[in-house]
Structures are given as structure tokens and as C-alpha cells.
Amino acid sequence: MKILVTGGAGFIGSAVVRHIINNTQDSVVNVDKLTYAGNLESLADVSDSERYAFEHADICDAVAMSRIFAQHQPDAVMHLAAESHVDRSITGPAAFIETNIVGTYVLLEAARNYWSALNDEKKKSFRFHHISTDEVYGDLPHPDEANNNEALPLFTETTAYAPSSPYSASKASSDHLVRAWKRTYGLPTIVTNCSNNYGPYHFPEKLIPLVILNALEGKALPIYGKGDQIRDWLYVEDHARALYTVVTEGKAGETYNIGGHNEKKNIDVVLTICDLLDEIVPKEKSYREQITYVADRPGHDRRYAIDADKISRELGWKPQETFESGIRKTVEWYLANTNWVENVKSGTYQSWIEQNYEGRQ
């Protein structure tokens, strides 16, 4: 099987590529524009494989996408290419509209034109797997808002969409496009919506890598608001396994939620990281003393939580890592891979961090 993976140099995309090359006999064509968060060093361990090919291309480029489909003849698409950082979407939403909505449309059309020319057997087995986020659902009631002993709801595959940020609105739009191409044209699509990912090779603008690296450098550990926002945390390698399971075994037209069963307040995540660093690389004062509280971001959702029963029941997938085991692996990886970290921390990244966090008081 040959799988075309868009965004394969990104955080989740590179985990998917590594999983396929290291754990299956399938081939990968990695299509990536290599924007600031795309890093081919994340694929150094698999880039020499005969089953791996790289195409430096933008999913918004219709000519390039048509050529890539015609040249590589994939059996499936795993579409991960996206602008994905909520804070960046607030200060610069245009890139999110262009990549996440227009790019998905261009890719769908290239896939549809390619798929329509396949023989019946290949048409039936072809899959266009669109990887999305739980943020399209909006937010859920927080424990602070619940009555005593009241069970808190979870996001299911039938939860209504209510995106809060330009990022989540752009992903919701792309989800709707993918489902429309199934219903209108018959393209065999699948959508997955996942919770917050963490793990190795994560670009250091997101909470967990930002906290690890700032802590080690003696910098402030910025916490939005009171830090009581709740997220469900999913180890990225567990997510990669889930995505491969869906593209190879999932039913066309279906949606699958993917979660880690690890609801944590942001402040508790940060405290856990500080305690691990106190254990592994202790210093005179606890890393907890570097925690600082900054103004919350606009429209910040208070709670996300995934019901992943469907993928477990129908496809047999379950996460292997607990949050405790996964966060320890993550901290240890960043401590052991300082060269990777230094190479991704460009001047552009530094100026963005200063603008986004140091201006919040």
C-alpha cells in the first residue's frame, strides 16, 4: 500500500510517517511545504528508506497536487497539512483560511480527479483520511459549572460543531468540505477528530514543549488565566497508531474520535513537568518557582474531553501510554535531543514568543 501523507514533516505527520516506515511494509509519499513548524530532521531515522519519498510542495498548488497524484499513484491519502496554533490564528487568521480551507479543497479536487480514473476495485479500496481536531466542537462544561455528582459530558462523533477560534473554525470548514465530497461525489473519505497531542518532535510553541524548554533555560513558565482549562492529552505515537488503523481499517463515510483518556488542568500539566525536571535535572530552587500567570487569550475554551469508545469498539484501538508514562518519555526526549531543539528555534520563533507571551501582563 502506498500512502500520500500531507504535512508529514510536522509534529503529528512525522509521527505517522515514522510509524508507517518502522512498523509496516507500506510506502509513504510525504508532501510538505516546510513552513516554520515543518522539520525534515524529525524524519532523519526513516528518510533513507526505499519506501519513503518526499515532495516539497504546497497543498494549495493545484498543478503540483495533480502531478503528485499522477506520478505516485497512492492507494490512500492521510491529510495532516494544516496551520494548527490557536494563538497564531488570532493574530494572523489569513494563513489558516488559505491552508486549512483552500488547501483542503485543492487536495480534495486533486484526489477526486485521480480517484475517478481508477478501476472499480481500486476506487472501492481508496481512502481520503482527513485528520482534524476536537476543537471544532467548541468547549464542554467545566467541573466548576457542574452540579455535585453530575456526570460531565464528552465530545462524541455526533456532537454539534461550535468552533471558538479562527483555527478551529478553519478546521470545521475543512471537515465539512471533506464530508461534502463524500456525499456529492462519492469520494471515500474518513474524518478523525483528536484531542491535544504531546510527545517527541513537538514544535516549541505549544504548552508542553514550551514549558520544558523555558524551565531548562530559567525563563518564565507562562500560564493563561488561572490555568484551570482542561484538556484530554494523547501521546503522539498512540495517535499515529490510531490514524494508521483508521486509514487501513476504517469505513468510508465514518468519523472517529481519538482521545487519550487523560483529562488534566493546564496548571497540573505544568506542575507535573516541573516535578519531573526537579527529579531528573534538579537545581537549587524548584522549577515551580518559574511559573507566572499571564492574561488569558480571547475565546479560550475551558474544557475538551473525547469519548473514544467508537474507535475502540469498532477498530480495536486503545492508547498504550498513560499521561504519567507519556510525559516522562517526552521530558526525557527533550533532554536528550538538544540539537533538534536548537535547530528549530529560529529567530522567527524567538520573536513570536516574545510578542505573544512577554506582552501579556
Curated annotation (Swiss-Prot):
One of its GO terms (biological process) is lipopolysaccharide biosynthetic process. It comes from the Bacteria. Keywords: Lipopolysaccharide biosynthesis, Lyase, NAD. Pathway: Carbohydrate biosynthesis; dTDP-L-rhamnose biosynthesis; Bacterial outer membrane biogenesis; LPS O-antigen biosynthesis. Its cofactor is NAD(+). The active site is at D134, E135, Y167. It catalyses: dTDP-alpha-D-glucose = dTDP-4-dehydro-6-deoxy-alpha-D-glucose + H2O. NAD(+) binds at residues 11-12, 32-35, 58-59, 80-84, 99, 167-171, 197. GO terms for molecular function: dTDP-glucose 4,6-dehydratase activity. InterPro entries: dTDP_Gluc_deHydtase, NAD(P)-bd_dom, NAD(P)-bd_dom_sf. Substrate binds at residues 84, 133, 196, 206-207, 222-224, 231, 266, 296-300. Its EC number is 4.2.1.46. Binds 1 NAD(+) per subunit. PANTHER family: DTDP-D-GLUCOSE 4,6-DEHYDRATASE-RELATED (PTHR43000). Homodimer. Belongs to the NAD(P)-dependent epimerase/dehydratase family. dTDP-glucose dehydratase subfamily. Catalyzes the dehydration of dTDP-D-glucose to form dTDP-6-deoxy-D-xylo-4-hexulose via a three-step process involving oxidation, dehydration and reduction. This is dTDP-glucose 4,6-dehydratase. The lineage of its organism: Bacteria, Pseudomonadati, Pseudomonadota, Gammaproteobacteria, Enterobacterales. The gene is rfbB.
